[in-house]
Swiss-Prot record:
Domain J positions: 3-68
Organism annotation: Caulobacter vibrioides (strain ATCC 19089 / CIP 103742 / CB 15)
SUPFAM superfamilies: Chaperone J-domain (SSF46565), DnaJ/Hsp40 cysteine-rich domain (SSF57938), HSP40/DnaJ peptide-binding domain (SSF49493)
Keyword Repeat: yes
Cofactor note: Binds 2 Zn(2+) ions per monomer.
Positions contributing to Zn(2+) 2 binding: 165, 168, 187, 190
Gene designation per UniProt: dnaJ
Domain commentary: The J domain is necessary and sufficient to stimulate DnaK ATPase activity. Zinc center 1 plays an important role in the autonomous, DnaK-independent chaperone activity of DnaJ. Zinc center 2 is essential for interaction with DnaK and for DnaJ activity.
Protein name in the entry: Chaperone protein DnaJ
Repeat region (CXXCXGXG motif), residues: 148-155, 165-172, 187-194, 201-208
Keyword annotations: Chaperone, Cytoplasm, DNA replication, Metal-binding, Repeat, Stress response, Zinc, Zinc-finger
Annotated function: Participates actively in the response to hyperosmotic and heat shock by preventing the aggregation of stress-denatured proteins and by disaggregating proteins, also in an autonomous, DnaK-independent fashion. Unfolded proteins bind initially to DnaJ; upon interaction with the DnaJ-bound protein, DnaK hydrolyzes its bound ATP, resulting in the formation of a stable complex. GrpE releases ADP from DnaK; ATP binding to DnaK triggers the release of the substrate protein, thus completing the reaction cycle.
Cofactor field: Zn(2+)
GO molecular function, one term: ATP binding
């Protein structure tokens, strides 16, 4: 199999614009309609299209550059592999030449007046970290196109029927000749439907659909992360001419929490610790999210503070983080300690602090003593004394 870059006559460093220009030139030169249906031209044209379909797709091009034809000729010819299956020259021509030339390829195969699937819809939903942690059932209101209940989707007034378009004869497409090309395009009179509604339905005004708001219940699974997507099949817009409904895609956004940050399945939380507790050791309460067995029904959990704890020390509580979507695993709650210096001291408290300071030395403050020693050596090196 020939190298795709060689087929298009370009180097491996060519940019997108150069690639498109090279393809356009070769496609026009080798198009079968310009070569009297020559089999060699048809084969060359197919080869050019295949090469461009891979190199114009960043992911496929990266796979091809790394693995060659093996990287794009997957067994299914699907995402990540071209393989020649599912290839439609009209998709490429629409991209490069526009609709006029794109409609020439496969246009006759596409039945504009056939049942059409409804549009997919997107709904952005904000949820709390608590809802992401425990799961939730949320009601949303979604506007969507519904089949008109009066005309049952025909667009025509009850008791009447749409007429066949006289321009396209019901095909939904018309054919015209432009230079070397025989071009098919959507019928301008009926809009490609092949039918004309002469007496429109008063409820949908001839569209066959009306827009309505629907209330849907959405189940948020425990453990979802920010940016997760939920698909509700058949909850999108109604299809045209009896086609199936589209799907509804719900994109989740988890609002920032005032206490917790999420890191994968772990929850991170900074908790202030009294100076005395940090020095002597002890226990403090840390917040945790309610749900399951992680906090035993409480919204706080006991954290052991080791003697001499410093700011920035972390304590990891196993299994008290977020649940996993795909297993029974749970993350951890990671508590970062922040040693709090007391303020607004009374005279007696200040006196005791001074007394404590006089009793503390290098043994009690090893980091301070180490820092002083380093600073002293630095000063001696600078001054030469």
């Amino acid at each position: 199999m020939r190298d795709y870059y060689e087929i298009l006559g370009v180097t491996r460093t060519i940019d997108e614009a150069g690639l498109k220009s090279a393809f356009r030139k070769l496609a026009m030169e080798h198009h079968p309609d310009r070569n009297g249906g020559c089999e060699n031209a048809a084969g060359r044209f197919k080869e050019i299209n295949e090469a461009y379909s891979v190199l114009s797709d960043p992911q496929k091009r990266a796979a091809y550059d790394r693995f060659g034809h093996a990287g794009v000729n997957g067994p299914q010819g699907g995402p990540g592999g071209f393989g020649g299956q599912g290839f439609d020259a009209s998709d490429i021509f629409n991209d490069v030449f526009g609709d006029v030339f794109g409609e020439m390829f496969g246009g006759g195969r596409r039945q504009s007046n056939a049942p059409q699937r409804g549009q997919d819809l997107r709904y952005d939903l904000e949820i709390t970290l608590e809802q992401a942690y425990a799961g939730a059932e949320v009601e949303i209101t979604v506007p969507a196109a519904m089949t008109c209940e009066v005309c049952e989707g025909s667009g025509a007034k009850p008791g009447t029927s749409p007429s066949v378009c006289g321009t396209c004869g019901g095909a939904g497409r018309v054919r015209a000749t432009q230079g070397f090309f025989a071009v098919e395009r959507g019928c301008p009179r009926c809009g490609g439907s092949g039918r004309l509604v002469l007496d429109p339905c008063s409820n949908c005004h001839g569209h066959g659909q009306v827009r309505r708001e629907r209330i849907l219940s959405v189940r948020i699974p425990a453990g979802v992360d920010d940016g997760a997507r939920i698909r509700l099949a058949g909850e999108g817009d109604a299809g045209a001419r009896g086609g199936p409904r589209g799907d509804l895609y719900i994109f989740l956004s988890v609002t920032p929490h005032e206490l917790f940050e999420r890191d994968g399945l772990d929850l991170l939380c900074t908790v202030p610790v009294p100076m005395t507790t940090a020095a002597l050791g002890g226990e403090i309460d840390a917040p945790c999210l309610l749900g399951g067995e992680s906090c035993d029904g409480e919204c706080k959990v006991k954290v052991h503070v080791p003697e001499g704890a410093q700011t920035g020390k972390t304590v990891r509580l196993k299994g008290k983080g977020m649940p996993s979507l795909r297993s029974r695993q749970r993350g951890d709650l990671v508590v970062e300690l922040f040693v709090e210096t007391p303020t607004h001291l009374s005279a007696r408290q200040k006196e005791l602090m001074r007394e404590l300071a006089g009793l503390c030395g290098e043994k009690q403050n090893p980091k301070s003593a180490n820092f002083v020693g380093k600073a002293k050596r630095f000063w001696e090196e600078v001054t030469g004394s």
